[in-house]
């Protein structure tokens, strides 16, 4: 990364970094951690660098402790190979799934598929059925769907994913039986995604009209979770093709477990997975603990997809702010409600542009000059793909996977159903297990909530929620009120966390103090966090983007990655690569010429080779840019050929920087006279 994004360093205002009570400079524990994990305090450490957290993750997974899994997922992310096991559990109990709310496309005004409007009468009722699709009901024909569901458009969009394969049926039939079987499995996977999208539209179609983003959400989910329970294949990514010509890779491939993993972590993951032998989302072993009973029913891919869409497209209920025609007061209302509730997609786009202009003024002005932001309301544009669809189609699968770890791990600390005594007891049991596993060292590894804020205490009564009348205040007062609301929400979560049936008042107070230091709950809405992640992503590439022309910028924004090599994308990659052209070329050439680097255990004899482009290119400004364009590092059976430990730290730095930008923005709004 080109900028220093570590907490407490850089050019941020000092008052923002002294407010986290758990951080003490110069402490013995910190010194020990810094010596053992030199990158921890440089915002570069991922969970795959921390064996302690990986072991803790496995413990929570064995007991199906969703509270612990969510904590690790949002704070440090998940090892890529573990997402297929953890994401289904997080999706079961996500607050946006248990209490879904989606704003109608008609209200957002960003749906460009006008044909769907005339089809609305034929779709399902406007009040969706709360029953869940049966896992046994994954097979079916087109006749089971209303004729208004655009199956042909869904299939057409799915074909875009395989455009780089360039294989037709005649070529496929000429291949070996093993390869033909893989293509048949690939076709079944696409049919499964197609049915998942169609069933979602059948259930929610009166609210959510068809959009290509729905298809790409399904494809993105299939890049981490096997869509077919009888197979362990996932999709390898939009930009990658396996050597045999498919878009598949085997989740049981040992190389997959070692991706971005050091030797210690690799042995931990492999030992854990050897207990389950071959992976299947329908073969997860259920623990004997009674509290896991609610997780006994396995979810089909269609059910997981529906829950994923509910999380990504979640929009809050209409806020209770005072309606006004004043642009100034409307801006203040948005500033107060967006961080706490997220807002509709149109509000989030407006908030993103506001933050972009204030936090990255030079790049924002350059984008305006190059007409990059024109037409952002069109659902085909990059801003919508980033903010509304959670990076589907636009971000690399590894960057998107880490961001989705945060989205799915988001929790406010409250029980899933505060009115259910059973749910409260389950929440308390999980919380007690989490607290029993957390010591000071583990807490340091997890760190505070990524979006902790400088609590504003002066002139604010944090014991009560702001009255609606207080919303029409100055911008500074609006921010104070908003931060007070965040503080109040956090205190409410702590009260739930520290209260247990059968504890006396003294024990409850002790638990409250312990939990304050132990559990870093989410403090801002996850879709608001996504806004700052988007700004941080742009900041990480700011200097390179300022050197590109509009067409190159748009190409990058629509196919973004924290580590990219193709063509002008080499300018966007980590600066270290600029001095390693010869070394990178040597690595690539040695790989292509080294037979021992080809794992042929399952590769059919007539497999199709994937050839990487290694030519140097010249960008539009006449600058020579090395383009190693690594071959399919996600191939079905081959070894990985890109530098494995750089990409995850790239997106980890982006997310850490997003928290810094959130604090910088809130500080600017508080101290500057706007």
From Swiss-Prot:
Composition bias, Polar residues: 1-14
Biased composition annotated in UniProt, kind: Low complexity: 125-138
GO cellular component, as recorded: cytoplasm
Biased composition (Acidic residues): 104-121
Region (Disordered): 1-33, 102-149, 590-651
Family membership noted in the UniProt record: Belongs to the OCA5 family.
Annotated protein name in UniProt: Oxidant-induced cell-cycle arrest protein 5
Encoding gene (name): OCA5
